Amino acid sequence: RQKMVAEHESYAEDLSFPVKPQKALIDCRKIMDKDDIVISDVGANKVWIARHYNCYEPNTCLISNGFATMGIAVPGAISAKLVHPDKKVLAITGDAGFLMNVQEFETAYRLGTNFVTLIFNDSSYGLIKWKQDMQYGHHECVDFTNPDFVKLAESFHAIGYRIEKTEDLLPTLKKAFQQDKPVIIDCPIDYEENMKLTAHLEQLMKTL
């Protein structure tokens, strides 16, 4: 456990860009109170959330996990905010999962919910790419282009921010939670970390 904690904390000051998922989740934990709610979409992001987002209270980090329900983060966040209007609600999703239920931002605005959606943007089906790279050593047909997520947010009467450098993420999260509308944060993410994690775990297994 001490080694895991040390590994986790080693990313706290990492300012490389795109943002490493470990660093993104450290910043998310800083902004969220212990009883605030995180909704994880399905994808590579859920692996990183499970490893690097510390939970202190029951039902404060909801991960669909093995059901593979991509697109759950935004509608899940709407529901969480309606049930717990006094708590901060953060949806963390990949770009692919987000686009599967993006239309629900109309619902979010219409119902007056002010939660934050953090998009881990890698312009691909990140978890599928990860699995292909592990199994075959290469990947096919998993990359795609994205819309301008800031303009997309504005088209739904929401607010959009784009992260241009890693040190902007924490203040942007703080600003986002001060808004009275739904917010989308487009955060380029460094999923080169995925295969590094695979290699690390393989080495760890050899020591057991």
Q: What do these predicted regions represent?
A:
Residues 1-75, 80:
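Active-site diphosphate/adenylate-binding microenvironment
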Residues 42-46, 122-124, 189-193:
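Glycine-rich beta-alpha junction loops
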Residues 47-125:
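Thiamine diphosphate
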Residues 55-58, 109, 133-138, 179-180, ...:
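Short, hinge-like loop/turn segments at secondary-structure boundaries
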Residues 105-106, 127-135:
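Active-site-proximal loop->helix
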Residues 132-172:
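Conserved thiamine diphosphate
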Residues 166-208:
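Glycine/aspartate-rich loop-and-adjacent alpha/beta segment that forms the canonical ThDP
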